[in-house]
């Protein structure tokens, strides 16, 4: 019996929508990363992007446990000398509501060209509306 290897042009991709209202950031991010990678499918192949498209709505209402709203730090650099900038989860959510979940999922995906292709299949929206109704996404409960 030969081992099955998925080919990129044979992969069937579905669309799923996740309502993040009141959900914990890490729990949502780990399931989203798993589905973007395609590990939930029996035809998963490590070197082929077999994952699905994920639409996350109500990203502005995602929660973190404990004191992480004030204690969790996010860093970025302006590319100028001494240009490191730091913000916490609370301020990041106020300024860019979907950025925290994007960064959490991106950190859970592989680094390199395959991981960059996977993160492009993640669509995050702060409110309940999204422009992907034509794809008929199936609701996914986490």
Curated annotation (Swiss-Prot):
Quaternary structure annotation from Swiss-Prot or TrEMBL: Part of the 50S ribosomal subunit.
CDD domains, per database record: Ribosomal_L13
Cellular component aspect of the GO annotation: cytosolic large ribosomal subunit
HAMAP family in the record: Ribosomal_uL13
Record GO biological process: negative regulation of translation; translation
Protein name: Large ribosomal subunit protein uL13
Keyword entries, A-Z: Ribonucleoprotein, Ribosomal protein
PANTHER family in the record: LARGE RIBOSOMAL SUBUNIT PROTEIN UL13M, RIBOSOMAL PROTEIN L13
GO MF term list: mRNA binding; structural constituent of ribosome
Top-rank taxon, per record: Bacteria
Function as written in the Swiss-Prot or TrEMBL entry: This protein is one of the early assembly proteins of the 50S ribosomal subunit, although it is not seen to bind rRNA by itself. It is important during the early stages of 50S assembly.
Gene name per UniProt: rplM
Record-stated family: Belongs to the universal ribosomal protein uL13 family.
InterPro entries per UniProt: Ribosomal_uL13 (IPR005822), Ribosomal_uL13_bac-type (IPR005823), Ribosomal_uL13_sf (IPR036899)
Coiled coil residues, start to end: none
Gene3D superfamilies, sorted: Ribosomal protein L13
Record's keyword annotation contains Cytoplasm: no
